[in-house]
């Protein structure tokens, strides 16, 4: 069968970005049974509302309004409450579809009994990688692998190009069974900006489901345009709070290391290079 997929896209003020995203879905998606839920967050320009009105004429599009401040987790949870599909597809507004089979490919992996969520390969407009899976502990809490590597390269042990289980993937484009999302309690709303996708994936894994990275789906990602500007001091403080939250809640995996990552490999370099050995680089007296 062809289950309904609910695509959830948060948006604020961005008309061109959103339009490029939505048009790429309409024009390029071979799979037909989907709805798009746009969660409008405090836009004020006449231009964006004109575009919303035009979009709303399409029966596949549902526009809902989140009137509180920016909180990525709360906005997406709100979107899910309006979703009719059994499958959720979280999508950033600055992502563009490349391949017609993207949704059906994600769905075929997500429909497997053991799969909880599916992430994909995201590439920058210059054809380098932005996301090919995440590793817990990378750069502190978690980080994307193979960042800035040319997209056609396969990387260490071909990992950038192999379908595989991982601890987490980014929610810039992530499909999840709705029942799995609800069982995990959705996105953690204390994590307003950072690590909410990592946290959700770890919750899903703790319920016994797998997180799968699917490199056969590639989308362009124009990176974080959907957040308003804010006071940088407040930003830093909030980021620290979110790091603390992750440290407290996921102490065990942060201590033991990501089960899908070799503990002899670096946690500061995303390219699977070896950790320096103790004493390396010291001059002999």
Q: Where do the protein language model's features map onto the residues?
A:
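N-proximal low-complexity "stem/linker" segments adjacent to membrane-targeting elements
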Residues: 1-27
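C-terminal, non-catalytic tails of nucleotide-sugar-dependent glycosyltransferases
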Residues: 1-5, 116, 126, 138-165, ...
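Acidic donor-binding segment of Leloir-type glycosyltransferases
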Residues: 26-68
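Active-site acidic Asp-centered loop
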Residues: 41, 91-94, 188
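Glycine-rich, basic loop-to-helix element that forms the pyrophosphate-binding segment
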Residues: 66-83
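Short aromatic/hydrophobic "clamp" motif used to bind/position activated sugar donors
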Residues: 88
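Conserved donor NDP-sugar-binding/catalytic core segment of glycosyltransferases
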Residues: 95-141
């Amino acid at each position: 069968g062809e289950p309904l997929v609910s695509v959830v896209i948060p948006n604020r003020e961005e008309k061109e970005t959103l339009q490029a995203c939505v048009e790429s879905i309409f024009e390029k998606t071979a799979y037909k049974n989907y709805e798009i839920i746009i969660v409008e967050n405090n836009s004020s320009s006449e231009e964006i509302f004109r575009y919303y009105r035009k979009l709303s004429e399409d029966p596949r599009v549902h526009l809902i309004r989140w009137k509180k401040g920016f909180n990525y987790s709360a906005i997406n949870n709100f979107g899910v409450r309006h979703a009719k599909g059994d499958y959720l597809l979280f999508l950033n507004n600055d992502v563009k579809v490349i391949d017609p089979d993207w949704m059906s490919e994600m769905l075929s992996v997500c429909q497997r009994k053991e799969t909880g969520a599916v992430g994909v390969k995201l590439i920058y407009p210059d054809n380098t990688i932005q996301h090919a899976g995440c590793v817990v502990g990378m750069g502190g809490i978690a980080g994307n692998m193979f960042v800035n590597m040319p997209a056609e390269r396969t990387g260490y042990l071909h990992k950038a190009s192999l379908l595989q289980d991982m601890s987490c993937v980014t929610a810039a484009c992530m499909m999840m069974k709705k029942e799995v999302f609800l069982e995990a309690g959705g996105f953690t709303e204390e994590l307003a900006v950072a690590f909410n996708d990592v946290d959700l994936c770890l919750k899903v894994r703790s319920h016994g489901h797998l997180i799968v990275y699917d490199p056969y789906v590639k989308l362009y990602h124009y990176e974080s345009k959907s957040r308003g500007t804010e006071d940088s001091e407040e930003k830093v403080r909030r980021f620290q709070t979110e790091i603390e939250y992750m440290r407290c809640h996921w102490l065990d995996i942060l201590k033991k290391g990501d089960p899908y990552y070799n503990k002899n490999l670096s946690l500061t370099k995303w390219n699977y290079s070896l950790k320096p050995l103790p004493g390396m680089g010291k001059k002999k007296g």
